[in-house]
Amino acid sequence: MPKMKSHRGACKRFKATASGKIKHERMNGSHNLEKKNRKRSRRLHQATILDSAKEKQIRRMILA
């Protein structure tokens, strides 16, 4: 059986932290920012930790 390949698109979007959590950038923060208020656009530029519901699935994609 061949080795499992990691999902290249997921590897570009998600990173594993030193403690093992999965970090990712938020969506909707790159364009059409004039429609969004300052508080929202500021928060969209901060990275966040992935919630536990999707963590197992993403971990298999990036660490395979």
Curated annotation (Swiss-Prot):
Keywords assigned: Ribonucleoprotein, Ribosomal protein
Region (Disordered): 27-47
One Pfam family this sequence matches: Ribosomal_L35p
Domain of life of the native organism: Bacteria
One Gene Ontology cellular component: cytosolic large ribosomal subunit
Gene3D superfamilies named in the record: 4.10.410.60
Amino acid composition bias (Basic residues), ranges on this chain: 36-45
Gene Ontology terms: biological process: translation
Matching InterPro entries: Ribosomal_bL35 (IPR001706), Ribosomal_bL35-like (IPR021137), Ribosomal_bL35_CS (IPR018265), Ribosomal_bL35_sf (IPR037229)
Molecular functions (GO terms): structural constituent of ribosome
NCBIfam families in alphabetical order: rpmI_bact
Protein name per its UniProtKB record: Large ribosomal subunit protein bL35
Natural source organism: Chlorobium phaeobacteroides (strain DSM 266 / SMG 266 / 2430)
